[in-house]
Amino acid sequence: MRRLSRNLVAICSTLALTAGLAACGGGSDEAGDAGDTIVAETAFNLKTIDPHRQFEFTGSTIDNAIYQTALEFEDGDLTKPTDGLCSYEMSEDNKEMTLTLKDEDAKFSNGDPVTADDIVFSFERLQGIKGNPSFFLEGVKVKKVDDKTVTLTSAEPNPALPYILPNSSIGIVNSKVVKENKGTTDENDGAEQFLNENSQGSGPYKVEKYDADSQVVLTANEHYNGPEPKYKRVVLRNVSAETQLTDIQSGQAQVAFDLNADQAKQIDESMGKISSLPSTRSLYIFNNTDEKIGGPAADPNFRKAVMAAIDYDKLTDLAGKGSQRMASLVPNEFVGAVPKDEAPERDLAKAKKLLKKAGYDGEKVPFHYSSDQAVNGVDLAQLAETLQAQLKEADINLDLKPAPSSTQLDGFRSAKQPMGIGTWGADFPDPTNYNVFIPGGDVADRVNWKDDPKLKKLADEAAEAKGDARDAAYAKLFKATTDTAVWIPLVQPVSTIAVGSSITKFVSNADVSFDFAKAE
């Protein structure tokens, strides 16, 4: 997925750069020399831009510019969903949401007005075609009440729903046109190719050209009911991080999404600006609780010794400027995050005392990780080697077990790995997305963590909490989860975006990594 972040308020960078709006170098209107064209570059993770099927970063980035959603997050503040195309109200029991069409002047790219029928069709299509994001509205009954009102009803309390609806995978499409082009609300839907080439949104842009291997071109939606974008054309190109660096330096591109910390340091003020935002990814150590599999890792004292032996400040140095300590797996900007000042601290003396309690005598513990994966610039192989060296200082011996990502993921899912590095990217900015780590959850099953009465009680209390009380209730739950050291939070990496000097103002925040429509 793409967005998310929690804790307080917005992590919003509306940055005014000092450079003028000079034209960029290059020989064609797709190379950055046209004053109304913005060239952005990323290593594509793209399968489709059909909003109800896409679930990858690049597709989400594109659909954010094409489609509007019923609700949205204002200025990147993921703790407070706000009105989008609709306003909303939740019932007292959190089982029913009422959406009221608010933006009655919103129009699709062909000039058709956005209606309640379009909202119902979009939600039901998301559910019915069974694409990757269909789980967002699983179990939700969608009903049109009148021309301005839609209700979403869940069998169980669903307080996360307002945090789910802003996702670009729930973009509102022109139901009439999509139906005319093989669109349905079941698995017989055949509109994907049409939507890849003929977007049907009401956002600031529409698709002009779609090539999942090389580039996607967007042009301004002349019927957009919002401020007219300064850049009428967006060219998103599929290139490596190395090429992105040279293109930003030379002015051939204005936005680069994939530079790591070392590459970002090579952008000086004459070339552009670096925007660093907390990512919504969590890096952690997992410990198998089954003694037959986990060995020492199944012992709470050993796990807590590992947690006390880690030098977390050095991990943030490794992750780069802007990365953060974590007190739980919930990112610091989310509702339910545990305050950073409660994060684990290094204490080697404490670690050695705990090891003595555990009866650990220096035996090697297999430590698994993906050898070919980097998460927001953090190379997991380098992270594993760093942890191995740090834990060695407490006389803990890790036996590194690198494997390709696909192999490692299968191994983790098998629940047969003693220890290792795990990663998690939020699907939506709500703490319920982390319930999978609580005993009985899907991810907890991977470490054979079946039951914990204390956590079950806290989880039940959090599920019953309403409104502002949810923040404290979930923070209490996930602090207690960290205290078990089954999951040891390591670092929250940073998302780095380079913006060329020809752009003098832009918005980049936790919800939308770069807002093309607001760039100047």
Language model regions located:
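Surface-exposed binding/hinge segments that line
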Residues: 134-184, 209
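Aromatic- and charge-enriched surface segment that lines or borders ligand/interaction sites
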Residues: 87-131, 145, 151, 296
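Ligand-site clamp/hinge motif
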Residues: 103, 220-266
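Structural transition elements
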Residues: 324-358, 374-380
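N-terminal lobe/hinge region of extracytoplasmic solute-binding protein
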Residues: 41-92, 124, 200
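Ligand/substrate-recognition segments at binding pockets and active sites
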Residues: 212, 356-426
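Gly/Pro-rich hinge or "lid" segments in bacterial periplasmic/extracellular proteins
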Residues: 168-226
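Detector for C-terminal structural segments
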Residues: 33, 211, 220, 309-336, ...
